[in-house]
Amino acid sequence: MSFNSFGHLFRFTSWGESHGPALGAVVDGCPPGLELSEKDIQPFLDRRKPGSSRFTTQRREADAVKILSGVFEGRTTGTPISLMIENTDQRSRDYSNVAQQYRPAHGDFAYDAKYGLRDYRGGGRSSARETAARVAAGAVARLVISEVKIQGYLVELGGDKIDRQAFDEAEINNNPFFCPDKAAVARWEKIVDEARKDGNSVGAVVECVAFHVPAGWGAPLYAKLDSELAAACMGINAVKGVEIGDGFDAARSTGRDNADALRPADQGDRVKFLSNHAGGVTAGIATGQPVVVRCALKPTPSIVSPLPSINREGEAVEVVTKGRHDPCVGIRAVPVVEAMMALVLADQKLLHRAQTGR
């Protein structure tokens, strides 16, 4: 197994490298009869694509998606859907200096240890460029779960957190940080600008919420909804931690405070919860509350400041990373986390239907 695929019934396989001619995904298990065209996918890729602001990498890619199979007369056929995105702005020469050197905190040494060779051009398969394929596949998944609304945003950048009391969903797509707090945007601009001037980078925290997830999706024990979400998010480049609901704060709480009390429902609902510390999942199964996931992303190690390392011969060297890179990879990770949420939920919907008939 090469582990380039994700999912059970709704499954996708990503392919391609950062500096190859193209990359893409093959989505398998999509139900037939759904209306699908490139126009359904492109808006999500546009949110992720590079070069959209001075706060992201200046690599310019249109990220224009092409549907190669699985769609006939505008509808899915139930057969594999192949999606392709061409790479058009590679500068492989920028990486010639690291062909024989290992960049600290990158996959260089680990890939060499596993495979005995590596594509050093932009990190090859380990590049965040691969996440474009996930976003494309996630756009297809959203069609399967049209009843669910998914919204991601940044809640922290460079150690600076948003003011939860100032949360405004309308602000999220009005700034380059996907930030719901207007006052935080100005602070984050300064943080990223200063990091770039200093030849450095900063980390971030992405929060993603899925609304209207039906109670019952998920499974106990070894296929829990929250474990599937955690695996999906931990597979994203630069993610070093995942929380569901209150996450680690739950360990600092008490049973009385952390329990999401239930009350008789209002009209049309089975139950009303008085809080959502669990993040919409208990015992691995959705409760019908919003599903809340947070991902911590490390600062990119692709910085212009010299870092101590070794070469393939084991000799001490200092590595300087050239090329064009994000000063904060967490910014463009927002649509990626959304995509992985969609892919997991589409899979869980089909699994729930297969198991229960509902």
Swiss-Prot record:
Catalytic activity: 5-O-(1-carboxyvinyl)-3-phosphoshikimate = chorismate + phosphate
Annotated GO CC locations: cytosol
Name of the coding gene: aroC
Superkingdom classification of source: Bacteria
Record-given protein name: Chorismate synthase
Pfam families assigned to the protein according to its UniProt record, in alphabetical order: Chorismate_synt
EC number: 4.2.3.5
Function as written in the Swiss-Prot or TrEMBL entry: This reaction introduces a second double bond into the aromatic ring system.
Similarity comment text for this entry: Belongs to the chorismate synthase family.
Enzyme class: lyase
